[in-house]
From Swiss-Prot:
Molecular function GO labels: ATP binding; nicotinamide-nucleotide adenylyltransferase activity
Protein name: Nicotinamide-nucleotide adenylyltransferase
Matching HAMAP family: NMN_adenylyltr
Compartments (UniProt record): Cytoplasm
Domain of life, source organism: Archaea
The UniProt record lists the keyword Cytoplasm: yes
GO cellular component, one term: cytoplasm
Matching InterPro entries: Cyt_trans-like (IPR004821), NMN_Atrans_arc (IPR006418), Rossmann-like_a/b/a_fold (IPR014729)
Protein's UniProt keywords contain Nucleotidyltransferase: yes
Disulfide pairings: none
EC number: 2.7.7.1
Originating species: Methanoculleus marisnigri (strain ATCC 35101 / DSM 1498 / JR1)
Broad class of enzyme this protein falls into: transferase
Keywords: ATP-binding, Cytoplasm, NAD, Nucleotide-binding, Nucleotidyltransferase, Pyridine nucleotide biosynthesis, Transferase
Length: 168
């Protein structure tokens, strides 16, 4: 059985993440999804809690044809220990899927197979762009799965982000 690992902050979870996970599901028997920086929320760069991000992922992936686990992972401030920390928080996995150079380097140094999936429309499908659109009152809903729109509305996420940023 092969188990893949994919980590992100998911602030918010968007169509680019969805595309990558759908591709991973075609090759892995199971997927472990790490919600990174789980301890951070209520900032402009990280407005959503780990629990809210777990909800976004779980609802968006209901129809994924691959079993998955969504696991919040808090940051450690020592990169040399990070892989061991991740491994202590997750089921065992064979392959890491990431385009983040640091994540790729750390897992490669630990002897883990690392695959770099093609990014999906990276210029428009990024958490930074989506949060900027929310702050500017621009349409953002088309950049995330419908379940994420529902979660963000349910938690009044746009209003939270605007209050945190000091705008209305």
């Amino acid at each position: 059985m092969s188990r893949g690992f994919y980590i992100g902050r998911f602030q918010p979870y968007h169509n680019g993440h969805q595309s990558v996970l759908e591709r991973i599901a075609r090759t892995a028997d199971e997927i472990v999804i790490g919600v990174g920086s789980a301890q951070v929320s209520h900032t402009v760069a990280n407005p959503f809690t780990a629990g809210e991000r777990v909800l976004m992922l779980t609802r968006s992936l209901e129809d994924l044809d691959c079993p998955f686990y969504v696991i919040p992972i808090e940051d450690v401030q020592r990169n040399a220990l990070w892989v061991a920390h991740v491994r202590s928080m997750t089921p065992p996995f064979d392959t890491v899927y990431s385009s983040n150079p640091l994540v790729m380097q750390l897992f490669a140094e630990a002897g883990v197979d690392v695959q770099s999936p093609d990014m999906y429309e990276r210029l428009t499908h990024s958490g930074t762009v989506i949060r900027q659109r929310m702050l500017g009152g621009e349409p953002w809903e088309h950049l995330v799965p419908p379940a994420v729109v529902d979660v963000i509305r349910e938690i009044h996420g746009v209003e939270r982000l605007q209050r945190i940023a000091g705008s209305d």
